[in-house]
Amino acid sequence: MRLDLASLMSAPKSLGSAFKSWRLDKAPSPQHTFPSTSIPGMAFALLASVPPVFGLYTSFFPVLIYSLLGTGRHLSTGTFAILSLMTGSAVERLVPEPLVGNLSGIEKEQLDAQRVGVAAAVAFGSGALMLGMFVLQLGVLSTFLSEPVVKALTSGAALHVLLSQLPSLLGLSLPRQIGCFSLFKTLASLLTALPRSSPAELTISALSLALLVPVKELNVRFRDRLPTPIPGEVVLVLLASVLCFTSSVDTRYQVQIVGLLPGGFPQPLLPNLAELPRILADSLPIALVSFAVSASLASIHADKYSYTIDSNQEFLAHGASNLISSLFSCFPNSATLATTNLLVDAGGKTQLAGLFSCTVVLSVLLWLGPFFYYLPKAVLACINISSMRQVFCQMQELPQLWHISRVDFLLQVPGLCILSYPTPLYFGTRGQFRCNLEWHLGLGEGEKETSKPDGPMVAVAEPVRVVVLDFSGVTFADAAGAREVVQVRERLASRCRDARIRLLLAQCNALVQGTLTRVGLLDRVTPDQLFVSVQDAAAYALGSLLRGSSTRSGSQEALGCGK
């Protein structure tokens, strides 16, 4: 397929014209760029389970690359909490923390080197996948990224980020939980170890949040009156570093600190390609999440400032950012909501704002690194949590979303799956119908993972309790297709009952309903399993989940599975 070379060559030209249209008096000041890039970069590196300095690398190289290739004028790239958390899960799974206790200096360096290698391999894999999507011109996928879907993703991930940072806030050394129900496993281990919390780190965390939260509220409430936002992160870092240095809390109370940040840049190194098969299952969702967040954020600002973005070019820009930066030991990156808003508020109008922020990160890498030696890691955890403020605030929109569109609201309810079958159900598609249904129900072979039809092995993230079969796209069904529905019901009856899954049928037209009636399916179900619209079925399913009826009755009534 022919690549769009014109879009590649137009990026330097757009940067050149930006010098004429961008006024220097609107350049973002260091007090904006320093707290929005350097400090969160080090904080998000802890989420990715790599040393803090690699967060600075990830705040530098991807910004340079995206500035040359991206089409989002107001977009700021770099470290992102959700991607860092997903990367950290892969790193912890492939290079777990040893159970032998304290490690020696050499052992710690070897462990960090292995973890950095895995994180860089994940970035390389996700970048390669996005470049492949650019070649296939899959930018049309951005049209399916509705606002409720993106908010559902970020809201759920924000809860994972919050719980993952609580051990650092409390001074607890707990292994990171991975796999299904990791959120609840982390919460259980946290509550169990709560009596062992460090009073010193707990005090540092409380004071840090007491400073950060009010400052961020003041910046939001008085953003029109303040000439510049209050740099709460900068003040906090300076105060915490000075306090830790003068009182020696790191040695007296065993408070964990950032330590030495190596100066300069890492040597370019190709990630271990042997790790790619092991991290493919992690690279694909990271690539999709990276594009989803970046494309939606770019579209918001493009609509606000009346210009257009090229979705395929965004695949190229973010793919190149991840792939090339992985050669410098960077972990996966994408556009960031907080940094983008800060740079826009500071007057940034083009990607030159991102290049300006690179100079601030460069100064930290070359000269200012030693000043962060005594910075407590608990402070970075507090910055992580406070940076997700906007994501937590968007949960307040759930009641409004419920009144506007209950189906969009239910996108954020775990345990519910709405499965739409958009083709006629006849002898040629009945096998595909059965495979798709079994895969979405998680009833394939194996306990922990299942194989998607014509696809790789993927993990089942959330257990499905209620499935709504949307038959609005089934225009007709022949005898073979209708009998397949009956056979699927008989074949899955026991497994649905054991897995406690309920199946509901919605929006079936009169022709298809008549065919299903003639083959005997509708004689085996009660009217409360049939719904006129998907919205009615979803509302009924939500009530069942809230009442716990799916746990009590399983699937004994769903499509006659219990008969």
Swiss-Prot record:
<feature type="transmembrane region" description="Helical">
    <location>
        <begin position="116"/>
        <end position="136"/>
    </location>
</feature>
<keyword id="KW-1133">Transmembrane helix</keyword>
<dbReference type="GO" id="GO:1902476">
    <property type="term" value="P:chloride transmembrane transport"/>
</dbReference>
<feature type="transmembrane region" description="Helical">
    <location>
        <begin position="352"/>
        <end position="372"/>
    </location>
</feature>
<dbReference type="GO" id="GO:0015116">
    <property type="term" value="F:sulfate transmembrane transporter activity"/>
</dbReference>
<protein>
    <recommendedName>
        <fullName>Putative solute carrier family 26 member 10P</fullName>
    </recommendedName>
</protein>
<keyword id="KW-0813">Transport</keyword>
<comment type="similarity">
    <text>Belongs to the SLC26A/SulP transporter (TC 2.A.53) family.</text>
</comment>
<keyword id="KW-0812">Transmembrane</keyword>
<keyword id="KW-0868">Chloride</keyword>
<keyword id="KW-0472">Membrane</keyword>
<feature type="transmembrane region" description="Helical">
    <location>
        <begin position="45"/>
        <end position="65"/>
    </location>
</feature>
<dbReference type="Pfam" id="PF00916">
    <property type="entry name" value="Sulfate_transp"/>
</dbReference>
<feature type="transmembrane region" description="Helical">
    <location>
        <begin position="152"/>
        <end position="172"/>
    </location>
</feature>
<keyword id="KW-0050">Antiport</keyword>
<feature type="domain" description="STAS">
    <location>
        <begin position="406"/>
        <end position="541"/>
    </location>
</feature>
<dbReference type="Pfam" id="PF01740">
    <property type="entry name" value="STAS"/>
</dbReference>
<dbReference type="GO" id="GO:0005886">
    <property type="term" value="C:plasma membrane"/>
</dbReference>
<dbReference type="GO" id="GO:0015297">
    <property type="term" value="F:antiporter activity"/>
</dbReference>
<dbReference type="GO" id="GO:0019531">
    <property type="term" value="F:oxalate transmembrane transporter activity"/>
</dbReference>
<feature type="transmembrane region" description="Helical">
    <location>
        <begin position="75"/>
        <end position="91"/>
    </location>
</feature>
<dbReference type="GO" id="GO:0015106">
    <property type="term" value="F:bicarbonate transmembrane transporter activity"/>
</dbReference>
<dbReference type="GO" id="GO:0015108">
    <property type="term" value="F:chloride transmembrane transporter activity"/>
</dbReference>
<comment type="function">
    <text>Chloride/bicarbonate exchanger.</text>
</comment>
<dbReference type="InterPro" id="IPR001902">
    <property type="entry name" value="SLC26A/SulP_fam"/>
</dbReference>
<dbReference type="InterPro" id="IPR002645">
    <property type="entry name" value="STAS_dom"/>
</dbReference>
<dbReference type="GO" id="GO:1902358">
    <property type="term" value="P:sulfate transmembrane transport"/>
</dbReference>
<dbReference type="InterPro" id="IPR036513">
    <property type="entry name" value="STAS_dom_sf"/>
</dbReference>
<dbReference type="InterPro" id="IPR011547">
    <property type="entry name" value="SLC26A/SulP_dom"/>
</dbReference>
